[in-house]
């Protein structure tokens, strides 16, 4: 179900196993591999949708967690996750304060001990400019104020 339509992106309800009430997804109208690789106008419009959602859920006493997972097309013979999709998940304010700690711990524990890239990057709330284009990654943002990214080196184990 499409909730809002912009010039470059749209907002829809999550129809495949939503995590909770209000779980929605921001996706581009035309194919874009990831938020990192999106044209400036697509990224700006997606960010504006995120800002509106943050304000809307804050008025209801909830905070948003934004997630994006980008796996390179055909890497390791796996099905692709090669289209930008920003998951928007509202959390009650009492739970949202603990979310950054849980995500940081999970990211730090998720990959091999010896990897080529840093295990975790502080994104400051936006993955663009943190992860280079063409890399597989997982990113999480907390109400656009803070966030983390992780470069996925082994997609088969991710």
Residue ranges and their predicted role:
Residues 1-158:
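HIT superfamily nucleotide-processing domains
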């Amino acid at each position: 179900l499409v909730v809002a339509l912009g010039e470059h992106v749209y907002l829809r309800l999550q129809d495949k196993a939503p995590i909770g009430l209000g779980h929605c997804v921001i996706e581009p109208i035309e194919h874009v591999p990831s938020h990192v690789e999106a044209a400036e106008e697509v990224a700006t419009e997606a960010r504006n949708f995120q800002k509106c959602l943050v304000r809307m859920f804050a008025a209801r006493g909830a905070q948003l967690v934004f997630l994006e997972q980008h796996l390179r097309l055909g890497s390791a013979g796996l099905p692709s996750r090669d289209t930008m999709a920003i998951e928007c998940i509202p959390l009650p304010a009492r739970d949202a304060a603990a979310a950054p700690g849980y995500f940081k711990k999970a990211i730090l524990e998720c990959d091999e001990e010896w990897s080529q890239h840093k295990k975790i990057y502080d994104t400051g709330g936006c993955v663009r400019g943190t992860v280079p284009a063409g890399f597989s990654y997982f990113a999480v943002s907390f109400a656009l104020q803070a966030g983390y990214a992780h470069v996925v080196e082994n997609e088969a184990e991710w």
